[in-house]
C-alpha cells in the first residue's frame, strides 16, 4: 500500500512546528536541496519604475513665424524682447527646466500653436 499526497499533507498538518523543521532539514539532506534558497529567490525585491515629476521644455526650432514664437516665449518666461529673441534664435535651447508635467505640456502647446518645434524631456 502506497501513501497518497493527501495522507502526507494530513500527517504534516498534525506535526508540531519543531517536527516540521526537522522534517525539512531531513529532506534537504536526503535530496541535496535547500528550502531557504528557493524562498530567497521567490521573495526578491521588486523594482518599481518611478514616475518622472519634473520636465524640461526645449525649443528645437522657431519655425516660419518667428515673431509669434518670440511673443509666446516672452509670455511664458517673462523675458524681455531682446532676451526672448536671442533665446529663440539660439535654438535648440532650454526654455524652462524642472517644471511640472501639466505646465510643460501647456507651454509646449502654446509654442507649437505659434509655429515652434518643441520637445518636452
UniProtKB/Swiss-Prot annotation:
Origin species: Escherichia coli O81 (strain ED1a)
Gene Ontology MF terms: mRNA binding; structural constituent of ribosome
InterPro entries recorded: Ribosomal_bL12 (IPR000206), Ribosomal_bL12_C (IPR013823), Ribosomal_bL12_C/ClpS-like (IPR014719), Ribosomal_bL12_oligo (IPR008932), Ribosomal_bL12_oligo_N_sf (IPR036235)
HAMAP family according to UniProt: Ribosomal_bL12
SUPFAM superfamilies reported in the protein's UniProt record: ClpS-like, Ribosomal protein L7/12, oligomerisation (N-terminal) domain
Family named by the database record: Belongs to the bacterial ribosomal protein bL12 family.
Assigned keywords, A-Z: Ribonucleoprotein, Ribosomal protein
GO cellular component, one term: cytosolic large ribosomal subunit
The protein's assembly and partners: Homodimer. Part of the ribosomal stalk of the 50S ribosomal subunit. Forms a multimeric L10(L12)X complex, where L10 forms an elongated spine to which 2 to 4 L12 dimers bind in a sequential fashion. Binds GTP-bound translation factors.
Protein name according to UniProt: Large ribosomal subunit protein bL12
Primary role: Forms part of the ribosomal stalk which helps the ribosome interact with GTP-bound translation factors. Is thus essential for accurate translation.
GO biological process assignments: translation
CDD domains noted in UniProt: Ribosomal_L7_L12
A Pfam family matched in the record: Ribosomal_L12_N
